[in-house]
Amino acid sequence: MQEQYRPEEIESKVQLHWDEKRTFEVTEDESKEKYYCLSMLPYPSGRLHMGHVRNYTIGDVIARYQRMLGKNVLQPIGWDAFGLPAEGAAVKNNTAPAPWTYDNIAYMKNQLKMLGFGYDWSRELATCTPEYYRWEQKFFTELYKKGLVYKKTSAVNWCPNDQTVLANEQVIDGCCWRCDTKVERKEIPQWFIKITAYADELLNDLDKLDHWPDTVKTMQRNWIGRSEGVEITFNVNDYDNTLTVYTTRPDTFMGCTYLAVAAGHPLAQKAAENNPELAAFIDECRNTKVAEAEMATMEKKGVDTGFKAVHPLTGEEIPVWAANFVLMEYGTGAVMAVPGHDQRDYEFASKYGLNIKPVILAADGSEPDLSQQALTEKGVLFNSGEFNGLDHEAAFNAIADKLTAMGVGERKVNYRLRDWGVSRQRYWGAPIPMVTLEDGTVMPTPDDQLPVILPEDVVMDGITSPIKADPEWAKTTINGMPALRETDTFDTFMESSWYYARYTCPQYKEGMLDSEAANYWLPVDIYIGGIEHAIMHLLYFRFFHKLMRDAGMVNSDEPAKQLLCQGMVLADAFYYVGENGERNWVSPVDAIVERDEKGRIVKAKDAAGHELVYTGMSKMSKSKNNGIDPQVMVERYGADTVRLFMMFASPADMTLEWQESGVEGANRFLKRVWKLVYEHTAKGDVAALNVDALTEDQKALRRDVHKTIAKVTDDIGRRQTFNTAIAAIMELMNKLAKAPTDGEQDRALMQEALLAVVRMLNPFTPHICFTLWQELKGEGDIDNAPWPVADEKAMVEDSTLVVVQVNGKVRAKITVPVDATEEQVRERAGQEHLVAKYLDGVTVRKVIYVPGKLLNLVVG
């Protein structure tokens, strides 16, 4: 064994060994308990970032630990390879998305291997290959036949100059990111999957997910947004149709003073025929971004349509306005407004001078003060005719019942959740397998024409999708009849909704899933990824699992038992102000800093001499140029050091502050472990440990070893507090470094301790542990070694610490044998000088003794 720890030499050797031995490849084995550990698959952007490294290190630690417990552990990896960034990169680099993507996959695969992650590479998949997306296409056609897929028009962001659809992130300040043209909202036909048919199950089954974070479950509950309310129909004077609205607050209905409809509503369109102001407003609404978050913060605007609706209970005429905060695709495209008791309605009414009628009393029973804002709390009704004096629940039921009896109301359960629009007007995605025949019939692509393959050898112009630009691509024939293929592609959330299941049978050619393999491995035991995926990906992931279950492919209700959302990785951020007043962000690697005595940054400059402004720690990002390249760190310190720092610096679900000083600390610790093993093995063979012949000091050290095993096992296995597990191993190492190594039993005990330390560190730092295990054992492979088990007998304390008080004040702490009697404890306490001086010349009136813990002598 060489004296110096040289990670650059040992890590590549160990990685080669894993590759050659196929150490982490697994197959179904009914004789073993399975464990499926999965990290969210990466988008092949070109390089790994520290967020990836943190996510995958957590997964690898858990997988390696479970493997050492003797379980059959599946830990696969793949590539979420379709998506918009590849199109932009292809245009920029004058290539096609496919070669750019495959090059990135090859590069990032090497980076993953360099970090020593124990993946089953035989199951690697890329979602952009026909071998993968063919089954998604087939499944979509089956959902269509079941009535779970339909086509309808829906609003998109449209660039009139480029004649193309834009994703929300391609709209910057209301303009096209490419040509700066004002973006419009346009209705185009799109494909939808009926996720709303599963809304109740998606909501109720959240209660089964005991090991998912409450924050994620709450976000999903709110997103699904189940509400109970009443659908109310209004007659409209001089208009052929009625207006229908939905409300969750029928108790406030007597305070409804106007209705609002979407700009695209037929009533608004009709009114605009003779109203130029309204027509201009409808035109303006076409330029409103579709994203719901934008809707919430934008200025609320509207125009009176001139139509009057009739309040069903009071008979009063109330105005109907067109408003930009009402969307056609949400509900009926019309809402009732109660400005006295809804803040948005209040602001709109105040702006346009509309009537505000209070109908709920304040908490103290007085009339509410509506001079500044609406009263949104529930309460007792007034100003509401026959319903006066009713509380919220009674009023809800009474008004709902009356509207129902009159035939103008109906109790309804509503969902905020909308059906999943899966059409994208992009090129780099899986083609949607639908065709339109010459006679206009729309039908799924027949099985014998699947997969519908996306051509990869294309030229990108950055505007139109190559499969839309090439009229020949869409042409096909079905049963001898000419037909046109759909040129939209799937939302890339489709691919990431079922990849976890395909990992169980990636080579299977008879269908989407091999049920036998899928049911052996599924559900996933732990799924690791960022909380930013809480509602989109993680909801579609759950939905797809239920679709596959109902197709008979899997027999579980939920895809993952446990979800672990890792925290973000933060780093220092610095900038200087350029000549034009713009911020130039400088990488923390290039910042020369001065710190105060507490280690805080007080001054910074870069190599060019710019005075830098330090903005504190923020999420590693391209925009702030504060990302740290994992590859540079691995080359400098080794993969094991980077992994150890990632797991030690912070609890897994909290933010992690990148500090190179902390990385250096992790590296020093591994050098200490190496040095101790080197010094131990240099002394030659070790005798067997004779537990019965140990001295008190040796027993105490052995007790520490086994207590550490117990703590680390609990911290990794049950609590998943990996940082405290590492801290416990470090503490033990400090004790081992000071332990005597001269005697035969000293060395035998050190051998037992080091074998335990190396196994406990193995999930975190597998390369160094692989090497040290071979040095300590002389044979075998740590990847097949079992996790150390704490010896209960070794942990039994021979002695205990007793606190000695005189008149309730602590005067000493004494060590006594565990089986000492009260008399023996009193005698031992009396020998303590600090106790004896308080007993001198006084009488002990009372003795309070808590065995093994406390002795209180009451004197007077």
UniProtKB/Swiss-Prot annotation:
Name of protein: Leucine--tRNA ligase
Keyword Magnesium on entry: no
Residues annotated to bind ATP: 622
HAMAP family: Leu_tRNA_synth_B
Motif 'KMSKS' region: positions: 619-623
Enzyme class: ligase
Record family assignment: Belongs to the class-I aminoacyl-tRNA synthetase family.
Subcellular location: Cytoplasm
Cited Pfam families: Anticodon_1, tRNA-synt_1, tRNA-synt_1_2, tRNA-synt_1g
Catalytic activity: tRNA(Leu) + L-leucine + ATP = L-leucyl-tRNA(Leu) + AMP + diphosphate
Source organism of this protein record: Shigella dysenteriae serotype 1 (strain Sd197)
Residue interval(s) of motif 'HIGH' region: 42-52
Record's GO cellular component terms: cytosol
SUPFAM superfamilies reported for this sequence: Anticodon-binding domain of a subclass of class I aminoacyl-tRNA synthetases, Nucleotidylyl transferase, ValRS/IleRS/LeuRS editing domain
This protein's record includes keyword Aminoacyl-tRNA synthetase: yes
GO biological process: leucyl-tRNA aminoacylation
Keywords: Aminoacyl-tRNA synthetase, ATP-binding, Cytoplasm, Ligase, Nucleotide-binding, Protein biosynthesis
UniProt-listed Enzyme Commission number(s): 6.1.1.4
InterPro entries: aa-tRNA-synth_I_CS, aa-tRNA-synth_Ia, Leu-tRNA-ligase, Leu_tRNA-synth_edit, M/V/L/I-tRNA-synth_anticd-bd, Methionyl/Leucyl_tRNA_Synth, Rossmann-like_a/b/a_fold, tRNAsynth_Ia_anticodon-bd
GO molecular function, one term: ATP binding
UniProt signal peptide: none
